[in-house]
Curated annotation (Swiss-Prot):
GO terms for cellular component: cytosolic large ribosomal subunit. This is Large ribosomal subunit protein bL19. NCBIfam families: rplS_bact (TIGR01024). One of its GO terms (molecular function) is structural constituent of ribosome. Gene3D superfamilies: 2.30.30.790. It comes from Methylococcus capsulatus (strain ATCC 33009 / NCIMB 11132 / Bath). Belongs to the bacterial ribosomal protein bL19 family. The keyword Ribonucleoprotein applies. The gene is rplS. One of its GO terms (biological process) is translation. This protein is located at the 30S-50S ribosomal subunit interface and may play a role in the structure and function of the aminoacyl-tRNA binding site. Pfam families: Ribosomal_L19 (PF01245). PROSITE patterns: RIBOSOMAL_L19 (PS01015). Keywords: Ribonucleoprotein, Ribosomal protein.
Length: 114
């Protein structure tokens, strides 16, 4: 194992990430710095994509806010991501749910995994 892999495994071991995948509804607590104070901001939505690359892993969360679709890409092991909570498990048959971008209302619903 080279030095880069060793450092990445050390950084990854310091954070516990719950098991989640595409279709799951998650709440991501993100650190936001405003001036000299820092607070946590919650971003709740459906995971539409997940990229598993060790320390460089990322996932995309989509939500509809005031009738406008909002997507945000989070680096899984970023120090800005404080916590990830899984609200509900979605039953989907795709790894990437980009088709949800074109759907609205009831058509964008995802069945819950039993």
């Amino acid at each position: 194992m080279n030095i880069v892999q060793q450092l990445e495994s050390e950084w990854m071991s310091g954070k516990t990430i719950p098991a989640f995948g595409p279709g799951d509804t998650v709440v991501v607590q993100v650190k936001v710095k405003e001036g000299n104070r820092e607070r946590l901001q919650a971003f709740e939505g459906v995971v539409i994509a997940k990229r598993n690359r060790g320390y460089n892993s990322a996932f995309t969360v989509r939500k509809v806010s005031h009738g406008e679709g909002v997507e945000r890409v989070f680096q899984t092991y970023s120090p800005q991501v404080e916590e990830i909570q899984v609200k509900r498990r979605g039953d989907v048959r795709r790894a990437k749910l980009y088709y949800l971008r074109d759907r609205a209302g009831k058509a964008a619903r995802i069945k819950e995994k039993i």
